[in-house]
Amino acid sequence: MSKKYDCIFLDRDGTINIDPGYISKLQDFKFFDFAVAALDMLKTLTNNFIIISNQSGVARGLILEQDLIKINEYIFEEFSKNNLGLLDIYYCFDHPDNPSSRRKPGVDMFVEASEKYRLDLSNCLMIGDTKWDILPAKILGMESMLVLSGEGEKHKNSFEEQGKPDYIFKNLLLGAIELIK
């Protein structure tokens, strides 16, 4: 399966970190134990990572934007400390009842990133734990991986035939092991 990618897009909650619901403070944010090891394996396929995350907790008043910024700073520090190339973190505050095309499954955050970093989206991979992560990847011609951590187990049977993920794995680590073979 080993292939080089321009970039690997990552969902945040349920993909690289434990998702207890809305994470409103830095002390509530916990990477999965396997996240760094998995990302270290994936960097053999690219060392360009971008996190794309819906963060409607801001619109709902459940998290302050300044607390989200602290969480993002921590994520950048951890990626840097582990020599993982995190290019950027894109997030959308939109409430699901009033979404713009930036909110996943909209594609705008991916398009913004591809323009800023000159990425060929057809040579990128999206990894997430919901159908809302996979759908924009399919629309944009990207490869996609559903991880069953987080919400993945709930979503794995909810795909139309043409929108199915290219890969389904129990978690990011098992997906990384298979992809680098």
Residue map of PLM features:
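Acidic, Mg2+-coordinating phosphoryl-transfer loop and its flanking beta/alpha structural elements
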Residues: 126-167
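Short secondary-structure boundary segments
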Residues: 54-55, 148-151, 172
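Conserved Lys-Pro-Asp/Glu-containing loop-to-beta segment of HAD-superfamily phosphomonoesterases
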Residues: 101-134
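Structural recognition of alpha->loop->beta junctions
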Residues: 72-91, 157-180
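Active-site neighborhood of HAD-like aspartate-dependent phosphohydrolases
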Residues: 1-50
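Alpha-helix N-cap and loop-to-helix initiation/capping positions
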Residues: 26-30, 63-70, 104-105
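Substrate-recognition element of Asp-dependent hydrolases with the DxDx(T/V) motif
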Residues: 35, 39-72, 85-98, 137
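A short acidic, helix-capping loop that chelates divalent metal ions and anchors anionic groups
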Residues: 20, 25, 57-62, 95-100, ...
